[in-house]
């Protein structure tokens, strides 16, 4: 049995309890060491980045939402699927499904108060890791691996680089670690002719928990099934393929149907998101990456921009070397390891397995599972070598050490320590002929545990990578997002109408959803595509469209988006947008600092009317600042002829500027070449415009990196010393891989920065137009210098300074808001109110458009219009009207029906065989 793989081995129940007990004890020990590292440094498992900004707010909110949903079920009320406090308003299911809205484990949030969600999040991380080990052991034992080998493999898998580096930052990344082994076990059941219940349940669990990892797991499951089928039947028994294929596909569809309640709505939203379907560039990996990857096989390190956390422990990688040292054994495993390693080295594979999106090896948990399985497989005979096999192992070890450390990127202290432990363990197994089985097991177990501790210390230790510094103390998450959040001040306001606020203080992103206030920030992976389009049209200086904070003090936008108040420190009122009153209407002491609330004197109400429309053709021809100006004169509609054409009365000018180049060559009308880092383009305005809001506008930006060495002639290179020449060559060896660039702006009224992500960046969202708002100042902008920090070709369709007079903004806003929605009620998935209009008009409601919205006017269904690219609209005739918008998640009804049907089918599949068996017994 040891010479085969992927063949079901029945009867492996012996010692199951002892194995689980041993695993539990060792897991507790190693997890305790992990936790102790954090405790000794005064930190929790809450990382300052994505954990605090996305996963923690999700879990707090989800617990509250579940409790509300339970009350709705008990009272017969409608369940909320739309929330006005998520960004500018968002669908709850599609926004949060990526973070575990369908994950059964996250249902525990319903029983935990928000204040204790931090502890729940930490507990779920530990629980998921523990379950990953149990799932791995079940799979390993099913395939005939020894108990001790399975134990070692489980520890190696659970404490590999993937959970160490990614599992705490993105807790949802741990989901496939326990779901995927269950999917493989279910597939084994189908091959063995057993019940498909586990297969269906595992697919449903994975798809419910996270749609992206379900996609990855499904692709890898197909590869696994091909390998198993080839091993079992080969090419000579293809007649068995159709019935097997029918079973695999049919039962998989049942599992997918069960998950459809979240999967179907999310898929519909995903296909329309800003990140989906973009044309991206996929650059080859640098040559040294192969060596760096090998060097870090024995560590918890090896960070790169592609999430390639492939490290395990020295003992585990020794298992891989032993596997290859023994010829004519475990051929399928060898092919699998080489195949997956090849995929890690091909960027296109990272793109395909990441949902045909940007390059990311987030499937690397499957590679570490394979390595852990290899360790479990070779463990029983790890000291039994033929002379030739010993020579093979020694040669492989030597080649590994030479290859892995031949480049500097691999010669880290942690990698060298991992290699040293690998060599020591290899020497032991080569010389352990006379050592007892218990002795060998003790050394291997100690080596495995020591490797885990070394990896934890190397990554989190303050003397090493010091990753623990990225985490925050216990209680920090609740304090910063809720208890001491500056937005708590808004709860003291007496204004009970619907309004948004902007923030000029340090407020955690996504925290408004925890306080039930309506902000202007958002950071979740899926976002409203129409809102993204509007921001793109307006040139918002946010290169990542699903991560935005505020409206960058652009006065017309603050008005158009209904921002009625701003949070600001009393000593920083000079930073307020132009039409905000400097007299605070509310103030409070929050977290040791004073926070005040300042009103916008020109904010539009949530529902206002436009009597004129701007055609899409006219609107698209405007510059970003002209667009925001035009929206104060009418409404942009996709339909034509509903309203008279608007007369654009705004006053946005672009003063003529003289361009001066320093270290930059203009190749053509739009292309500028900076041969060296730090080139400058200076625009000098002969007739500056005063008393306005001033912005710098970039349109059609693109960037192609070049090496500064290419611009140096032979004479310049020869004048340099050999050392300096090699240093420059090394510095710019991978210039072509640059995936982002920024423009540094220097002017007489302030400094700024515009960031641009190239198509080869994982953060690329198709943005090429940007506006940097300098705001208003006592003096006009006279000169601005654009610093090009890196050598390369910069393409700008347009570089300009634009100045917008604000004299008429308040009056035009007052005209739009003269006939507005009154007695506004925000209900569950609904917004309604009353309005009286004197002319034919379009009611614009500042909520993101979605096909899930419907509207009635005076009880009669009407067409929901897409207004101003991203908002809701409805046409109204003169008179008094009652308007009611209602939201239903697109695809939710169909998804729920499919889920119900899937559950019924699963129950039937489970029950029918049992009933038949019972019936047969009765007949006998």
Label each region the model flagged.
Residues 194, 213, 335-348, 352-481, ...:
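Contiguous transmembrane helix-bundle modules in multi-pass membrane proteins
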């Amino acid at each position: 049995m040891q010479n085969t793989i992927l063949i079901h081995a029945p009867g492996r129940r012996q010692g199951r309890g002892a194995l689980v007990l041993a695993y539990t004890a060792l897991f507790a020990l190693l997890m305790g060491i992990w936790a102790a590292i954090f405790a000794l440094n005064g930190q929790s498992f809450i990382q300052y980045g994505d954990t605090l900004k996305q996963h923690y707010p999700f879990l707090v909110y989800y617990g509250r939402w579940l409790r509300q949903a339970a009350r709705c079920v008990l009272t017969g009320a409608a369940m909320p699927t739309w929330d006005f406090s998520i960004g500018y308003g968002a669908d709850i299911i599609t926004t949060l499904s990526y973070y575990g809205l369908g994950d059964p484990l996250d249902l525990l949030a319903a029983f935990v108060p928000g204040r204790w969600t931090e502890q729940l999040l930490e507990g779920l991380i530990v629980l998921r890791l523990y379950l990953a080990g149990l799932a791995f052991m079940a799979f390993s034992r099913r395939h005939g691996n020894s108990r001790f080998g399975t134990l070692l493999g489980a520890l190696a898998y659970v404490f590999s680089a993937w959970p160490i580096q990614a599992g705490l930052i993105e807790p949802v990344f741990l989901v496939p670690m326990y779901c995927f082994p269950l999917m493989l076990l279910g597939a084994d059941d189908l091959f063995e002719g057993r019940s498909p219940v586990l297969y269906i349940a595992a697919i449903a669990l994975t798809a419910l928990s996270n749609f992206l990892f379900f996609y990855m797991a499904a692709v890898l499951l197909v590869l696994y099934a091909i390998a198993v089928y080839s091993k079992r039947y080969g090419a000579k028994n293809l007649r068995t393929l159709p019935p097997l294929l029918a079973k695999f596909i049919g039962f998989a569809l049942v599992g997918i149907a069960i998950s459809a309640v979240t999967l179907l709505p999310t898929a519909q939203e995903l296909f329309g998101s800003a990140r989906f379907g973009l044309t991206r560039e996929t650059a080859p990996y640098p040559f040294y990456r192969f060596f760096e990857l090998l060097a870090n096989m024995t560590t918890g390190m090896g960070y790169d921009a592609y999430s390639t956390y492939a490290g395990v422990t020295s003992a585990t990688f020794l298992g891989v070397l032993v596997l290859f040292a023994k010829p004519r054994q475990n051929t399928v495993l060898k092919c699998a390891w080489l195949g997956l390693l090849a995929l890690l080295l091909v960027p296109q594979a990272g793109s395909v397995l990441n949902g045909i999106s940007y390059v990311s090896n987030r499937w690397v948990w499957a590679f570490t599972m394979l390595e852990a399985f290899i360790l479990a497989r070779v463990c029983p005979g790890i000291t039994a070598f033929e002379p030739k096999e010993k020579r093979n192992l020694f040669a492989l070890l030597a080649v590994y050490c030479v290859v892995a450390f031949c480049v500097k990127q691999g010669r880290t202290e942690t990698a060298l320590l991992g290699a040293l432990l690998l060599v020591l363990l290899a020497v032991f197994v080569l010389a352990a002929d006379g050592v007892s089985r218990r002795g060998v097991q003790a050394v291997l177990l100690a080596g495995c545990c020591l490797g885990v501790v070394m990896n934890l210390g190397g990554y989190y230790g303050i003397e090493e990578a010091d990753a623990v510094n990225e985490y925050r103390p216990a209680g920090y998450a609740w304090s910063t997002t809720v208890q001491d959040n500056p937005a708590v001040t808004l709860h003291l306001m007496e204004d009970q109408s619907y309004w948004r606020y902007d923030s000029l203080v340090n407020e955690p992103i996504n925290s408004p959803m925890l306080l039930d206030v309506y902000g202007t920030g958002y950071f979740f992976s899926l976002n409203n595509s129409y809102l993204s389009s509007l921001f793109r049209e307006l040139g918002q200086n946010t290169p990542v469209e699903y991560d935005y904070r505020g409206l960058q003090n652009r006065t017309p936008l603050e008005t158009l988006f209904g921002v009625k108040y701003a949070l600001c420190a009393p000593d920083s009122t000079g930073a307020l947008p132009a039409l905000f009153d400097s007299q605070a209407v509310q103030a409070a002491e929050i977290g040791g600092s004073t926070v005040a609330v300042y009103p916008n004197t020109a904010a539009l109400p949530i529902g206002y009317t436009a009597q004129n429309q701007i055609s899409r053709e006219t609107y698209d021809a405007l510059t970003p600042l002209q667009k925001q100006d035009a929206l104060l004169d009418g409404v942009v509609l996709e339909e034509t002829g509903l309203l008279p054409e608007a007369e654009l009365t705004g006053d946005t000018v672009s003063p003529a500027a003289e361009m001066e180049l320093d270290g930059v060559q203009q190749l053509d009308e739009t292309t500028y070449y900076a041969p060296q880092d730090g080139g400058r383009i200076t625009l000098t305005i002969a007739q500056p415009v005063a008393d306005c809001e001033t912005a710098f506008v970039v349109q059609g930006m693109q960037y192609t990196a070049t090496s500064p060495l290419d611009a140096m002639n032979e004479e310049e290179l020869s004048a340099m010393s050999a050392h300096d020449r090699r240093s420059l060559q090394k510095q710019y060896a991978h210039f072509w891989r640059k995936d982002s660039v920024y423009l540094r702006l220097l002017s007489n009224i302030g400094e700024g920065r515009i960031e641009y992500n190239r198509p080869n960046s994982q953060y690329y969202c198709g943005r090429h137009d940007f506006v940097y708002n300098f705001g208003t100042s006592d003096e006009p902008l006279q000169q601005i210098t654009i610093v090009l920090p890196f050598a390369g070709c910069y393409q700008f369709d347009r570089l300009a300074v634009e100045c917008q007079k604000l004299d008429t903004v308040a009056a035009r806003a007052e005209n739009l808001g003269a006939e507005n929605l009154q007695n506004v009620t925000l209900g569950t998935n609904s917004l309604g109110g009353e309005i009286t209009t004197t002319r034919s008009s379009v009611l614009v409601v500042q909520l993101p458009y979605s096909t899930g919205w419907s509207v009635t006017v005076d009880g009669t269904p009407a067409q929901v219009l897409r207004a101003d690219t991203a908002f809701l609209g409805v046409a109204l005739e003169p008179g008094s009207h009652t308007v009611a918008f209602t939201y239903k998640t697109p695809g939710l009804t169909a998804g729920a029906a499919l889920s119900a049907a899937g559950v019924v089918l699963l129950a039937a599949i489970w029950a029918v065989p049992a009933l038949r068996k019972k019936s047969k017994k009765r007949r006998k």
